[in-house]
């Protein structure tokens, strides 16, 4: 039986096919990174200099808001402009298999067979947020492969909204006209992370009300009514319609400030999608002109460094037999009240794995 080639050789062959633009190589690279198989760090290290050209767009919102349908329409708009699109869809985890419970290929079947589109569903795997630990690295692989746009869609529950904002250049929050969504947006802190709001299913009653509520909140947040005041006092028109003031500010082509626009869409008809695509382009221009893009990407790099550090520490310490033996032999001391779990970790960090290995029975 022929022995499997070393990991370095497998990665080298994979990279050769990857550089040749073979879709199968892209799929294998994504799987290697997602599952952290042997060689994935070498792969990401080699690809790192090629990363940074793609625009990363995060899409989040409550279940049933039509995120996948709207994403499909946005993909169609980008493909019409001859742009290649990668989609990373984070799905709930199956409690039995640990895999994505509902792959987005089912919901995006109209674009799934397009050679200029790549779709991968990732599982949350029990993480508190909707973004799996591998999402940013998978996006890096798609970036290095040459995709122009990378859309990251999340389940929109828990802390996933914050996760998506950290992973994307631009964050789109999708709401629906049903009562309470706009107030819930404020409670969930979405006002702080949304770069664009979309009220989807706008053919339902209440869409204009939700948009006005969001624009009112934006107006209060950005102080637009106050800014509109003349030197003799308050602009009564702006105070009477702060939502319109926010809307007008959102349409300004100003590289120094950004007011999130609120866009009405009917995704299954394609209504509002051109305006959404235009607003995404405007926001990208703002990010570049204001320097905010560099700030966001540096913050993302810092978080990736911390993720790598956490992974390495976990692999080198918690998987070390000497460390496990030290913890096991320390359990009686914890039970007897001699030391707390925190004290054991302090001892572990002070001694370090090499010292523990020398003193373990």
Please identify what each model-predicted range represents:
Residues 1-49, 233-245, 324-329, 344-361:
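Non-catalytic terminal/linker segments enriched in charged/polar, low-complexity residues
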Residues 177-205:
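Flexible active-site lid/hinge loop adjacent to a nucleotide/diphosphate
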Residues 196-284:
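Canonical P-loop GTPase G-domain recognition
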Residues 256-259, 263-267, 271-356:
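Long, well-ordered amphipathic alpha-helical subdomains in the mid-to-C-terminal portions
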Residues 101, 137-138, 163, 167, ...:
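Alpha-helical scaffold elements adjacent to nucleotide-binding pockets in ATP/GTP-utilizing enzyme cores
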Residues 9-20, 27-65, 70-160, 167-182:
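Nucleotide-state-sensitive switch-loop elements of NTP-binding domains
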Residues 22, 91, 153, 200, ...:
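Residue-level signal for inorganic ion chemistry
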Residues 44-63, 71, 93, 159, ...:
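Glycine/charge-rich, flexible interdomain linkers and switch-proximal surface loops
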